[in-house]
Every structure is written in C-alpha cells, then in structure tokens.
Amino acid sequence: MQEHPSISKATVDRLPRYYRCLRQLSDEGVSIASSEELGRRLSINPEQIRKDLTAFGQFGKKGVGYYVAELKESIGGILGLDQHLSLAIVGMGHLGAALANYQGIERLGFRLAAIFDSNPVVIGTRVGERRVEDIAYLAEIVAERSIQIGVIAVPAAHAQHVADQLVAAGISGIWNFAPVKLHVPPSVPFVSEDLSV
C-alpha cells in the first residue's frame, strides 16, 4: 500500500470496504455512485466517506457523484492491488484445492505461483495451470519464483511446521487458514482466517 503518513488508521482501514463496494457496484453495471449510495451500502456516514476520499485526492463531482470505475482503480492503486503479489498455497486438501481453483484470486491482487503438498498421491497432479510441487522443494521454489505470500491450508497439527518452513524460505507474509494460533517472527506480516464462525 502507498504510504500516507498523515492519514488516520481508521481511514486506511475503511479503504478495503470502499473498494469491495465499488467492485460490487461495477459488477452490477453502475457507473456513477453518490456518497449517499456508498454510505447506505456500507452503513457509513456519507460525510465520512467524502472526508476519507478527500484525504487521498480529488474524486468525483459535486452534485454528480463518483465515477465507479475510476474510483475503484484509484483505491486499488492506493491499496497496492495494481501490483499482484505472488503466493504459494501449502496443502491440497479440500480448502487448498478450493483456494487454488478460485477464479477471482487475481481480482484480489494475487498471482498463484506455486502449490505444495507432502502427499505422494497429490504431488505431480495439476490444479489449473499449476503442478502440485513436493513441499521438500519449498525453499528452492520460493526463491526461484520470488514468492511473497505463503497460504497455509493444512490440518492444524501441521500448520506451525509449515509456517516455520515458509519463514525459513524467506516468505514476506503468511495467510493462515488452519484453525490454530501460529507463532511467527514480528517481521513477518500474518493474517489468520477463522472459517469456523
């Protein structure tokens, strides 16, 4: 994400919500949306939306609204979504396979660079354009393909070991889908998804 040191964390935290709403409006064929429409959809005061967006530049026209495609592209740029991060999925169970087959992954700002598993039955099979690699070669492939994000989709009992392998391989961040709390160095950004709720 671009640096804007004078902008509040609360404003920055709302940007992904604005982006998702604009993407939905775009998918619905809406070309112009007012701050009132955005506010209604997001349950955010329209004045707050105008204030948040003004912090990043001039968007929209008074009395007209915001051009959805233009604002979506601008917020995507601020969030860094115009730069696809390469990711590797570790674990080809049901969840890993679903993530690997998800067609919208590039819309989220990611590029699937590798898939890993330890099961000999799965290694060598294909998921879309990608071949499932042996996790024994994780460090080598992460370096070769400049992989930035490691996605953990393994059972809880194996998740910490996989996290350790990803960190040792030099991964920049971890996205954990295993239902367990993991310990990673503070220098490695870490997001954990709890799918049980």
Residue ranges of each PLM-predicted region?
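Glycine-rich Rossmann-fold phosphate-binding loop(s) that bind the pyrophosphate
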Residues: 92
